[in-house]
Amino acid sequence: VIKKTQFENLDIITSNVDLSGLEVETADDSNRAFILKTKLTAYLNDSRRLYDYVLIDCPPSLSLLTVMALVSSNSLLVPLQTEFFALEGLTQLMKTIERIKVSLNPDLKIRGILLTMYDKRNKLSSQVEKEARDYFSEKVYSTVIPRNVRLSEAPSHGMPVLIYDKTCPGSKSYFSFTDEFMNQESTIGSAA
């Protein structure tokens, strides 16, 4: 299931069509929210499998797979599009996180919020950024990912943007974000 990539120390597990029936297949399982956590924990406890980070990319909808990912995680990195309905969606996500913390995963926390699809020519992007920074303050990363045509094109070519065009503004922003994230991680690690 795990696939090596062209990047050293980066493995991936891709989604597949079999996951679409998961909700129906597990309908009678009272512990279904813990299926991913159980499997992931068992896999990671094998000493031959050492990973610094496990990232789970979730769809914006609140499906069983998303709940499983939230139950399996210790922290969240929330991408927030700087668009009209994004803050409303974030409010819903916050309510969901609180419910999951109460009943399924008390250790879940938001690591940070990454503003994406930012268009400096658009007043709405600036307004969403301001509201996010006012409300979530230090949780919002300094780096902002701009709206960029190369970011949109890369998936249609079956490539991450960092391979498709590592010099485009979107790629440069993701590199900056990675630096910011890792610097934050080293600060958290040294404070522990």
How does the language model describe each region?
Residues I35, Q92, S173:
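Charged catalytic carboxylate motif
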Residues S15, T38, T143, R147, ...:
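Active-site donor-binding loop signature of nucleotide-sugar glycosyltransferases
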Residues S176-I188:
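C-terminal alpha-helix
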Residues V1-R49, L104, A154-H157:
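P-loop/Walker-type NTP enzyme "switch/lid" segment
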Residues P155-S176:
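C-terminal boundary of histidine-terminating zinc-finger modules
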Residues N45-V149:
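Conserved catalytic-core segment of NTP-binding enzymes
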Residues D29, A86-G89, G170:
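Short, conserved glycine- and acidic-residue-centered signature motifs
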